[in-house]
Amino acid sequence: MANEIELGSLDLRYESFRLKQPALEERLLSSILQRGIEEPLEGVEVEPARVLLNGFKRYRCARKLRLATVPYSSLGQDEAAAILGLLKLSNHRTLSILEQAAFIAELKTVRRMNGAEIASELSRSKSWVTMRLGLMAELSAGVRQQLLPEPSPFTRICI
């Protein structure tokens, strides 16, 4: 169930994991202007913040429209479990392979999960996980910067 939350209360630490699509974002902005935000932003409750995982385009549109509140749905309090949940749904939601790779690298490096654990949790093969980890490892910093957006100045508001 979605609740209304203050836009400024969101921690955007994963914004740089998601690709920007300006044309799609412009269409979304127009839609939100006409009908409001129809699908809640999704995140995880990590004290003292709400960490946004899904809905960065909606977030940026809300900020452009100077909305004070947005609909928000919590994916729980366990950050690793929430990321795994987002990845499980990535076939139904449009996470690109690069976005998947960034989240999997986060699970491996920061959350200290190994490839077999990640594969098992996602019901995927170890090679599926390894391919995405390899993709992140092979990207130079310059290419990664061009493909993935720069973090917003508000990225770590509550950390």
Task: Provide a role label for each language-model segment.
Residues M1-L75:
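Short, charged/polar connector segments at secondary-structure boundaries
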Residues C158-I159:
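A short helix-loop-helix "switch/interaction" segment in the helical subdomain of ASCE P-loop NTPases
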